[in-house]
Amino acid sequence: MVKIKKTKGMRKQIRLNEVEEINLLKQWIESQKPDSGFNPLSLRPLPKDSKIGKSEDGKNGTVFSRYAGVRKFAQLPISDKTKRGLKDAKYVDMTDVQSAAIPHALCGRDILGAARTGSGKTLAFVIPILEKLHRERWSPEDGVGCIIISPTRELAAQTFGVLNKVGKFHKFSAGLLIGGREGVDVEKERVHEMNILVCAPGRLLQHMDETPNFECPQLQILILDEADRVLDSAFKGQLDPIISQLPKHRQTLLFSATQTKKVKDLARLSLRDPEYISVHAEAVTATPTSLMQTVMIVPVEKKLDMLWSFIKTHLNSRILVFLSTKKQVKFVHEAFNKLRPGIPLKSLHGKMSQEKRMGVYSQFIERQSVLFCTDVLARGLDFDKAVDWVVQVDCPEDVASYIHRVGRTARFYTQGKSLLFLTPSEEKMIEKLQEAKVPIKLIKANNQKLQEVSRLLAALLVKYPDLQGVAQRAFITYLRSIHKRRDKEIFDVSKLSIENFSASLGLPMTPRIRFTNLKTKKKGVYESSIAMEIENAQEYEAPLVVKKDLLGEDLEEEDFALKPRKEGKVVEKSTKEEEVLIPGNRVLKNKKLKINLHRPFGSRVVLDEEGNSLAPLASVAAEAGTEVALDEERMNDYYKKVGAEMRKADIEDKKVDKERRREKRMKQKIKRKRGAMEDEEEEEEEDHDGSGSSDDETGRNSKRAKKIVSDNEENGGKINTDSLSVADLEEMALKFITQ
């Protein structure tokens, strides 16, 4: 296809058409905007034969079609460029959340939207972004007009891809700012020219702090994707500084599957009369109806057996497995990978580099495999190919976490299945899920198909010693995650069979764990923390000293909370211990005595012939009754005698040292002389080869060389300085000097 070169007149006509289109869209939006608080879903869709947009009526003049409650993107008051992008991306029909949110967003209102996972929330804010900047005729010279904040890098990258698909016919510049990759300097150079920024909170704050003159005074719209997670305390230290640098007069859109309505959170964002859009609030279920959800009661020591058996019986499926900590992910992935279940295994967690995470993510999409992951994949991600199973080996922290996890399957009305493992002490989680309108069914395991993997893991730990440290960290971090959970009705470490759980990981001995109460001096409150001790049968019972070279390079603060973070004043340990979870049930060595740090220094003990201790100077004391008095004459004689011995020894030491240094200098001088002679010989050989030097010079050099060459031919004609005496070395050095 040949491109037609646009003339000046054509470009002018295009600008006029854009201005005319923008004016038409503004009139359309203003004339048919829904009332605040109105639910567009309560209206019926427009008839198929109804006219869209502007029309002329003889009685009322110019009228516009209604766009609230429509079900197709073509019926919205949006630009032709956006419609073309939607059509190329094969987006035709609108979902419920899109139909409810977009009409209010086009009017410039703040929105607080909640909808099920996989319901199309991304398009619900991407379209208003493009239209807002299009109506304002935004250009790269205007700077940043929109910021989209996502809690994870993968979700930000996915949103950036959708934005590029739909907005490819617009001329806006967009940038993706996420951590874990190189190119920060390049970002600093170009971030000022971006109109739309899709970013993670940490990277955006880094540019606000480090990039010169990076400001957003003309920001038009702010988007928080997975808003309940972004507003969580984990991102508070990053989000609050970001919000403080943004203008208050802006449009703000918040979207998530589980939304917050806390006044404090809304006040932080300066929302102005937001529209609360909860599409599925009145629905019978809180999860997609096409999702089949099951739960099994599995003891903690049987979880890996059950997981292994499940994988072996579903080799032709795409399975997403959630675990509590990244240490568990690492151990289960490495151990199962060595056992070769017959299906590709992948792992993904937050500490991996961004390139590696995206590579694993792409590989999981391409083929049927098992992906072990943490909650880093629990939110927002839309896999191009449907996930068949979501398996939650560990109980989620709350109902919201469960909904986000199972939301990775059964997206956009596709079929999906989920399986949740609960220990007997976590059965109350079923009641909480049912209260939240989650239709979950309790099933029993088929013990005939259960394959025990604990013995295989024990053999692996013997064969691969490095894997034992990974297993220990997985054991400890899992118990720590349970201990840190707030809902103590469900999560109780004391109700778990710790020794059996340790054996199920293949560990020969159970790591020792102790829980203590920590009191913060500044706040005056008790904080629960976990102190851990790992000991072998040969070791004495003492607190664990955490060092990276002992437990591996990947030991991180979040895995071992031995000490709380110090904020201002020192955090003191309470003398009272809650409990010792695992008592020492094996013979240990006696405790080593500690050195008394407060002992007096410089003390001296003198013993007599019978072994009794005396005063240091008692040997020179005068024998005069019971009183101890010093004999000055004997003391002076003693000092003179000792002084004479020291002076004599000092003279001998000086002689020995002088002789040693003299020999060292001689050896160095001989080496230097020998090196100089060899250099001269090489130069003479080169002169002889190149210009025919005289025989006299060659003879003199050969005679001189004979003088420094030893007669011992076994050494190859080299001087053996180690076998020569000092006198020989002096004589040889004197000859060299006279020459």
UniProtKB/Swiss-Prot annotation:
Gene3D superfamilies to which the protein is assigned, alphabetical: P-loop containing nucleotide triphosphate hydrolases
Basic residues composition bias: residue spans: 661-674
Keywords linked to the UniProt accession: ATP-binding, Coiled coil, Helicase, Hydrolase, Nucleotide-binding, RNA-binding
Motif extent (Q motif): 71-99
Positions annotated to bind ATP: A115, R116, T117, G118, S119, G120, K121, T122
InterPro entries: DEAD/DEAH_box_helicase_dom, Helicase_ATP-bd, Helicase_C-like, P-loop_NTPase, RNA-helicase_DEAD-box_CS, RNA_helicase_DEAD_Q_motif, SPB4-like_CTE
Composition bias type Acidic residues, residue spans: 678-688
Domain Helicase C-terminal: from-to ranges: 303-461
EC class name: hydrolase
Catalyzed reactions per annotation: ATP + H2O = ADP + phosphate + H(+)
Domain Helicase ATP-binding: 102-277
Domain of life: Eukaryota
GO molecular function, one term: ATP binding
GO annotation, cellular component aspect: nucleolus
Assigned EC number: 3.6.4.13
Motif (DEAD box): 225-228
Region (Disordered): 656-725
PANTHER family: RNA HELICASE (PTHR24031)
Similarity comment: family membership: Belongs to the DEAD box helicase family. DDX10/DBP4 subfamily.
Domain notes: The Q motif is unique to and characteristic of the DEAD box family of RNA helicases and controls ATP binding and hydrolysis.
Protein name (Swiss-Prot/TrEMBL): DEAD-box ATP-dependent RNA helicase 32
